[in-house]
């Protein structure tokens, strides 16, 4: 079970060839349970200019399992952000902290192309696809 970060979805939908995109295509072909959350969907859709393309991507992302953060999830995300900062890691996106908190809550690996998660994994036992 995996939650896919915005960075990988954007590369996929823009047709960029990369290792993370190839791995995502492999995960989809293997019918691995793929999770997302509203903020990931929002970030992906925010970068699409065409209304028609935005609707298609929204439909595509709607096929995956949507997990919803609770107040406790948000508090955990804030803890992740603060603890990483204390340990010398600047996390650029609080959304990444929220996605990490969801990964812990739902026992998910994160498939990413974003150094914030690798920084979080230096402080917390975050499971990242391909890093085992």
Regions found by a protein language model. Name each.
Residues 4, 36, 68, 111-112:
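Short beta-strand scaffold positions
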Residues 51-55, 84-85, 127-130:
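Short, hinge-like loop/turn segments at secondary-structure boundaries
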Residues 5-6, 44, 77, 103:
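Generic structural signal for small/hydrophobic residues in well-ordered secondary structure
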Residues 65-111:
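Active-site neighborhoods of divalent-metal-dependent phosphate/nucleic-acid chemistry enzymes
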Residues 9-10, 41-44, 117:
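A generic structural signal for short hydrophobic patches within well-formed alpha-helices
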Residues 6, 38, 95-97:
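Conserved glycosyltransferase catalytic-site signature
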Residues 1-36, 46-59:
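Short, well-structured N-terminal submotif of metal-dependent ribonuclease cores
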Residues 1, 100, 104-132:
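Acidic, PIN/NYN-like endoribonuclease modules and their adjacent C-terminal/linker elements
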